Amino acid sequence: NIHRSPFGGRCSEYFSEDPFISGMMGAAEVQGIQSRGVLPTVKHFVANEQETHRSIGGDLSWLSEQALREIYLRAFELPIIQADAQCVMTAFNRLGAIWAGAYTELLTDWLRGEAGMSGFAVTDMYDGTYMVKVNEIVAGNDLPDNFVGEDISELKDYGPDGAKANPMVAQALRTSAKRVLNTVVNSRGMDGISQYTRVVREATWWQLTLNIAQWALGALTAVAFVLVVLDGKKKGAKK
């Protein structure tokens, strides 16, 4: 992101107030990280230049198309065209009145069409108060961050056999899944894994010990609470 003010809450994470410097430094960092088979995520896409109120319904960023293209998008475009950046993280804020993470013209037309990014987009930490899951998937946002079980179940409803069967949503889900899987399978995240690999979940001795200790402490706390309540009742009865 761009330094609009020296008082920005996360200026320490961003490179510069200049889009070219920001973009070229970002491209160099992306190139170095991806050369090791790791997937860096360029963020926050886009025009997320303040922390105050950014996640309370989505801070509204008002700007012209010229400013958006020449300043804010340029810092993201350079890592993509210079270093083939594969991933971006969308922002909490809105562009005008539309959340950046569900903006079709931004995520599909510009990011995939004009800039040519082939990987996947992921949201910032998911906030269901204004981030609508279906809208973001259809717009081209592939991987909602911090999803939990009921969120996944809700998306399944849009499949062919779901209660909300919708071919457009189903196709968008397939496209998103393909982008995520294709990107990850071409990273080092799949090193040493083949179709014959079997993943086995095992608990270590210290995990088992910690779980037993937690249960024991929980039981002792419950017993202590009951004893305190009973003692209080006895003292009250004596009075």
Residue ranges, per PLM feature:
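Glycoside hydrolase catalytic-domain context in secreted enzymes
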Residues: 1-239
